[in-house]
Amino acid sequence: MALTLADVDKIARLSRLHLTAEEKEKSLQELNDIFTMVEQMQTINTDGIEPMAHPHEAALRLREDEVTETDRAAEYQAGAPEVRNRLYIVPQVIEE
């Protein structure tokens, strides 16, 4: 499937892009190269090949679901000008 300049014009119009004649020619060549590559990929026999999310085997190193940090909220909030119910109180910046 090869695109024409009319196709590039339509794509540009739908995308609200303003392309010069030179940009249209370059886009036409690049898009046709992409379609050629896709057509080549479609000819590859993938029967018996399991689909995968990523080409690399990745083993996740999981740890036990245990708390590894202590609650330090009081320590963090000690320097705050005002705290109420573990929430930082800040001046109102948006009028109602």
Curated annotation (Swiss-Prot):
Keywords: ATP-binding, Ligase, Nucleotide-binding, Protein biosynthesis. Its EC number is 6.3.5.-. GO terms for molecular function: asparaginyl-tRNA synthase (glutamine-hydrolyzing) activity; ATP binding; glutaminyl-tRNA synthase (glutamine-hydrolyzing) activity. InterPro entries: Asp/Glu-ADT_sf_sub_c, GatC. One of its GO terms (biological process) is glutaminyl-tRNAGln biosynthesis via transamidation. The keyword Secreted does not apply. Coiled coil: none annotated. It holds the Pfam family GatC. It catalyses: L-glutamyl-tRNA(Gln) + L-glutamine + ATP + H2O = L-glutaminyl-tRNA(Gln) + L-glutamate + ADP + phosphate + H(+); L-aspartyl-tRNA(Asn) + L-glutamine + ATP + H2O = L-asparaginyl-tRNA(Asn) + L-glutamate + ADP + phosphate + 2 H(+). The keyword Ligase applies. Belongs to the GatC family. Heterotrimer of A, B and C subunits. Allows the formation of correctly charged Asn-tRNA(Asn) or Gln-tRNA(Gln) through the transamidation of misacylated Asp-tRNA(Asn) or Glu-tRNA(Gln) in organisms which lack either or both of asparaginyl-tRNA or glutaminyl-tRNA synthetases. The reaction takes place in the presence of glutamine and ATP through an activated phospho-Asp-tRNA(Asn) or phospho-Glu-tRNA(Gln). This is Glutamyl-tRNA(Gln) amidotransferase subunit C.
